[in-house]
Amino acid sequence: MRKIKRLNSSLAEFRREFDELLLRGNVDMDTVIPVVSGLIKEIRTQGDAALLAHVAKFDRWNPKSAMELKIDPSLMKRAYEGLEASLREALHSAYNRIHSFHSKQKPQSWLDFEENGTILGQKVTPMDRAGLYIPGGKAAYPSSLLMNAIPAIVAGVKEIVVCTPTPENEPNELLLAACHLCGIKEVYKVGGASAIAAMAYGTESLGRVDVITGPGNIYVATAKKLVFGQVNIDMVAGPSEIGILADESAKAPWVALDLLSQAEHDEMASSILVTPSVELADAVDVEVERALERLDRKEISSKSIYTRGAIIIAKDMNEAVSLMNEIAPEHLEVLVENPFGWLPEIRHAGAIFLGENTPEPIGDYIAGPNHTLPTGGTARFYSPLSTEHFMKKSSILSFSERGIRELGHHCAKLAQTEGLDAHKESVLARLV
């Protein structure tokens, strides 16, 4: 029987092995930066001509003009109308729940009125134009379209652009249907680093955007990293991952399937179980092997779970939680007797799934919170994609005459200390 790599916190070599595990998110972008930089430069200097050439090279069809890259909204409408009723119902259910959750996130403008007549506050404004990158082809994910588009819609973004690779010029019908559901009219058959560059810098036919969000391969991730500063981005994400905290009460068949739910995404995905129960660990090994036999993506899942997966035996649940905080997984399932009791101790995770009836896939599709999450330990400082990614804040200041007289001399003193005479005089002129 094959077994998932196992670490035990009581062994001398544990720290070394655990530190190696923490490097799971390290992706060597250095090898692809020259290629991606070249593609970006071509888009910046050649515009649509470069886009057409890149589509011909990478997606294996030959558009004659930039007009052919844009998908007619009527095709999206037709794709939506062609959906079977149950699938349309599922998409609408997902849309409504995602919209409801992200509406609760939306920040509000505010003003604070001081006694001396001074007004301070914050104005929250949506971005003018957002670019969504959605992987395409046979592996197109309409759920990714919903998760990226709906926060932008809730934020109030007026113009939403979608770029998606379309091999052999065959758009994914389900993705087109999801675009229609979201009311998106501007969809381009462009993928990879070329799409990121086009959205960041603009071409003759594709106007530049203010923020780019969405998942992609290492070329897409590298391109997003390189154009950051020209535009805002959501995050630089790597392969998918799941961490599971479990005690002896967890059901081994469920734990096994939950680990495999991420392993089937990608050979580079990480699936990690941390538990104080050796009995559970042994049972999960058996159940993983059993489940693999009936999975369509057995080859990918098997390679992922046995080369990138791990089971960590902790001395108790306190240590298990501490180790999981170091891992800071993209998805964290808490399969213990009292999951909410451990919630205050969990500090670092993209999304936290509490209880045995909350498997990670429910968050991928229908729960409501966003499934675009920080990976590779970046949950220590990054947050999930949210409505706020599509909004920006401006500070508001309005001083009354009394207000500036009360604070002006303090301001002038600080400006003088920093040697900025014009700053000082600008304030003092109003105190005469």
Curated annotation (Swiss-Prot):
Known cofactor(s): Zn(2+)
Keywords: Amino-acid biosynthesis, Histidine biosynthesis, Metal-binding, NAD, Oxidoreductase, Zinc
Repressor listed as a keyword: no
Biological processes, Gene Ontology terms: L-histidine biosynthetic process
Pathway assigned in UniProt: Amino-acid biosynthesis; L-histidine biosynthesis; L-histidine from 5-phospho-alpha-D-ribose 1-diphosphate: step 9/9
Note on how the cofactor is bound: Binds 1 zinc ion per subunit.
SUPFAM superfamilies xref list: ALDH-like (SSF53720)
Cellular compartments per GO CC: cytosol
Binding site for Zn(2+): 262, 265, 364, 423
PROSITE patterns per record: HISOL_DEHYDROGENASE
Name of this protein: Histidinol dehydrogenase
Organism: Wolinella succinogenes (strain ATCC 29543 / DSM 1740 / CCUG 13145 / JCM 31913 / LMG 7466 / NCTC 11488 / FDC 602W) (Vibrio succinogenes)
Phylogenetic classification of the source organism: Bacteria, Pseudomonadati, Campylobacterota, Epsilonproteobacteria, Campylobacterales
Name of encoding gene: hisD
